[in-house]
Amino acid sequence: METSILSGLEASKALYSSLESRISHLKDRGIVPGLAAVLVGNNPASEIYVKNKTKKFESLGLKTDVFRLEESVSEDKLLSLISKLNTDSEFHGILVQLPLPKHIDSEKVLNAIIPTKDVDGFHPENAGLLSIGKPRFV
């Protein structure tokens, strides 16, 4: 078997070209895809990651909102926000930036995101689809 080097830049360009076309078709139908990014606390690495994601989304003409919560937010309040975002038609995807504070059950929070809005693919349904070669988003 021959080894080859994958060009991340070339793969990225091809992916974004495909995305631009798909986004254009959605916008023609009056749909502007939206991402809700949830950031708890002020972890510098998480801040950079979310900033880069939202910048890329915005460059594609997509709607992005970052929901910033204090490090001390209760799990119930975070779950309430997830529940609200699950039913908000402006957002087609939800990203909860990890790590979460120790007093919050990350698994419980990630499982609260409805599978069709789980952009990270952490929900058991999405992980299962990926494991059988039928990924929802990847």
What are these regions (language model features)?
Residues 40-55, 133-138:
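Glycine-rich phosphate/diphosphate-binding loop of Rossmann-like nucleotide-binding domains
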Residues 95-138:
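Anion-binding alpha/beta catalytic cores of soluble intermediary-metabolism enzymes, centered on
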